[in-house]
Structures are given as structure tokens and as C-alpha cells.
């Protein structure tokens, strides 16, 4: 796959079953610039994706969706669950007043973590403000 390092991965997971009694771990993956046909579990033959195939076999698959043609608005939409025409303030801004899936997971008793490309300009409001306990991200602030 072209530049797997550039794949954007959101990960949200509960730490242990004792901390989140009876609740499943949640792993959400959003890949930047990756087509449906790039995963062998979807019938693709151009790449070998055994780990993604294993996750697809053992988890819930989200196969019918719409996305923006560029990555930053897609991330804002995924974080908020709100279509871009309703949550848009300006390009790449995640509104500090909005509730994200990180907030919702924390309210449900999950420990939260996010990894990958952030690139959501929001001044002094970083991932912790948006409901994430831990993070390993690049492009946390916008380049000048």
C-alpha cells in the first residue's frame, strides 16, 4: 500500500474488562487516502493486509458511508458525528464547544486514546480537551 506511514489511524480502546465491566474494547480505524479495494478482506488483490483482514473477520464492519474528498473535514466529521455543512467554522477547525466521540466514550466509562494525524487546528485546545486521556499524534498544531 502506498505510504502506510501516512495512514491515519484513530484508536479508541477500553483498557481492561475490569475497568469497563462487560463492555467491549473499541478500535476505530480511519485510513487517509485508502480505497475500499485496498484491503484483501474487501476483495482487493493488489495488497496483502492480513492484520486488517483479521480485524474485519472478528469485528463489526462499517461498509456503507460517505466521506469528504480531503482528510481534515473527514476527521472533523468523524470526531463529531455531524455533517460538515453543519459543523463547519473554517477548514481544519474542530470546534472546542462540540462533543466528540472521545467525550462520549469517557462518559460511558472507557479509557480513551487517539493515535495518528491530528491536524485539527484549535489553538490551545488539544486532544485532552476533546475527550482523550492519551495520544500519540503528529501535526497537533497547524504549520504556519
Where are these regions (language model features)?
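Formylglycine-dependent sulfatase
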Residues: 2-5, 15-144
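Hydrophobic alpha-helical targeting segments used for export or membrane insertion
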Residues: 10-14
Amino acid at each position: 500500500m502506498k505510504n502506510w506511514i501516512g495512514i491515519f489511524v484513530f484508536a479508541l480502546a477500553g483498557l481492561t474488562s475490569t475497568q469497563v465491566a462487560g463492555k467491549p474494547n473499541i478500535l476505530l480505524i480511519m485510513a487517509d487516502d485508502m480505497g475500499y479495494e485496498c484491503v484483501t478482506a474487501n476483495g482487493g488483490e493488489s495488497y496483502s493486509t492480513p492484520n486488517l483482514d483479521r480485524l474485519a473477520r472478528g469485528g463489526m464492519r462499517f461498509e456503507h458511508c460517505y466521506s469528504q474528498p480531503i482528510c481534515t473535514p473527514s476527521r472533523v466529521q468523524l470526531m463529531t458525528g455531524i455533517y460538515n455543512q453543519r459543523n463547519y467554522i473554517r477548514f481544519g477547525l474542530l470546534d472546542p464547544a462540540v462533543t466528540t466521540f472521545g467525550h462520549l466514550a469517557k462518559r460511558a466509562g472507557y479509557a480513551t486514546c487517539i493515535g495518528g494525524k491530528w491536524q485539527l487546528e484549535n489553538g490551545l485546545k488539544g486532544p485532552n480537551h476533546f475527550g482523550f486521556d492519551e495520544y500519540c499524534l503528529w501535526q497537533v498544531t497547524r504549520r504556519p
